[in-house]
Amino acid sequence: MKKINHWINGKNVAGNEYFHTNNPATGEVLAELASGGEAEINQAVEAAKAAFPKWANLPMKERARLMRRLGDLIDQNVPDIAAMETADTGLPIHQTKNVLIPRASHNFEFFAEVCQQMNGKTYPVDDKMLNYTLVQPVGVCALVSPWNVPFMTATWKVAPCLALGNTAVLKMSELSPLTADRLGELALEAGIPAGVLNVVQGYGATAGDALVRHHDVRAVSFTGGTATGRRIMQTAGLKKYSMELGGKSPVLVFEDADIERALDAALFTIFSINGERCTAGSRIFIQQSIYPEFVKRFAERANRLRVGDPTDPNTQIGALISAQHWEKVSGYIRLGIEEGATLLAGGPDKPTDLPAHLRGGNFLRPTVLADVDNRMRVAQEEIFGPVACLLPFKDEAEGLRLANDVEYGLASYIWTQDVSKVLRLARNIEAGMVFVNTQNVRDLRQPFGGVKASGTGREGGEYSFEVFAEMKNVCISMGDHPIPKWGV
């Protein structure tokens, strides 16, 4: 059986204790995983701290070369990494192989360029003073990454962190550790010096908690649940934070929308990545005049989605990450029905047509709950699974009010041909990201993050400087400006 250890200071470090990680589709044990704690975190942070001065002072061009080299190695290993990710998470292979793992490579290529554009600004004050700013690395960063798209999200954090001259300790979710281990190995193969990137495996309550609280950690980039994010900010002390937390993103479909494209995007936005995505459009508001027809067609198409073996290229919905998470999502479906929603597709039970080797897997059919009231728990709480809540609305004012009537504010989606309406809604909707007449299409230059309970801070492009860089001002006298003569 494969044994997953830690990567600390360039070495593969065995753990004192191990636990199993399982394939969500079959239930089989994939690997034994080292269970790190405070001792391993201390070693990793010490290694990162020792490596920081030399790495931070490495010429940007050289750091960029190493980032590109790591991106190239990922490109060369896409099939293997994708297969590993699918086995570890239950995500369909066509999504890991064609989208998520290649995106990870792009992260390193992109930030290799960004790190060479770390230009400050100058502020002359008449002919007396010259101020200029320096963009400098923070130091040791804690990167805490989730289980839903682990490799892509890990590289989304590692790439800007290292490219900007920081060193890091990466802590992946204990539910999806395999590709993070591979990332640590590839980083060393790319020539990134020992100690610059350390990977510690283990549980969030032990390894994760020790990492974010460590006094030598200067910045924390966390992606995960809102409750955990709040706890980190309460206990970890005075650090820089980027918190990408939960979401309950609204989709507003107006009667003048391109209905075919809106249907395509709404289905994709909630059901891709098994519905386990923070930007999922899980509350779909449809204007009353088109509500019956839209709901009917949405449910028909949801019923036709292919659920099954994640390794089959034709599968669209794979297995949820764990049995515990399956119980949570299934429980929300039952709750929605109890609250009065109409079940039009899917349901809380496992599919009955699975082959024998998948019957122990965490499979759930894409579920459509119609006639949902926005006050229901299924409309207010993050389910994080393939469950779409469909709600009618009367007009623009009501649509906006309902969209904002939730504690989260990560992504939002607007479907209309009315440009004036788009401009009003984009300004007034409470979300960090607004997508108009499109699904979630990312550009690595754009800021990613949310408002309200969806987090704080932004990452992406130059916005990653917020957490991974410090701005220093230097003020130089250019002449004989007056200085007060005290004590003369």
Which sequence ranges carry the predicted segments?
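Hydrophobic face of amphipathic alpha-helices that form TPR/SEL1-like repeat modules
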Residues: 1-26
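N-terminal alpha-helical segment of soluble enzymes
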Residues: 24-89, 289
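Short, well-ordered beta-strand elements within core beta-sheets of diverse protein domains
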Residues: 29-36, 51-57, 143, 251-254, ...
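Long amphipathic alpha-helix in the N-terminal Rossmann-like dinucleotide-binding domain
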Residues: 46, 68-79, 93-118
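Rossmann-like NAD(P) dinucleotide-binding subdomain of oxidoreductase/dehydrogenase enzymes
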Residues: 120-261, 393
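A short hydrophobic/small-residue beta-strand
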Residues: 167-169, 343, 433
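ALDH superfamily catalytic-core signature
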Residues: 227-373, 436, 483-484
